[in-house]
């Protein structure tokens, strides 16, 4: 069957699974890892391990890097899992000039972590543009949009923690009603025009 591969995995092999991420990095219900929680920030989403982005404990690199002698990842003194993740992501910006991130399931990570990522990515893009003036498309700063299920046209805390726009989940249903009668969209557009004075949303028709 589709899930038969699970029959070949020893999920209780504590020593074996410790060679994976390591307990300082993730929580998951396999091996000897800490169990996931039941809130948005510590749960195991879609059976995936939850990265301990809230941890203040110095973690070192994930254990699996010890099996990768050709890795470019280097241990950084004093870094926590969040510090490593934001460092690695912003390094892509610094190396390749990536000018924006679209964040999925933003509610499952602490707001402070998103702000840390935005701050570091913004600095990294500025460095890249300064070093590559012939490749830079514009002088705009790093841009970040995110998905938080059910978010509509409102200036939530996400905007105060690094996000320039959030996906507007309301518009899909509103546009579907307009498809039957265009007059139905008038109120929606007027409400958006009234609200979107100092912030923006990313509206979509279908995903």
What name fits each language-model region?
Residues 1-66, 177-200:
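Core domains of carbohydrate- and sulfate-ester-processing enzymes
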Residues 2-17, 87-206:
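Active-site-proximal helices and loops of the catalytic beta/alpha 8
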Residues 37, 84-87:
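Residue-level detector of functional hotspots within protein domains
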Residues 47, 206-207:
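A generic secondary-structure signal marking the coil-to-beta-strand transition
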Residues 68-72:
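Short glycine/proline- and acidic residue-enriched helix-loop micro-motifs
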Residues 76-83:
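Alpha-helical scaffold elements lining the catalytic groove of polysaccharide deacetylases
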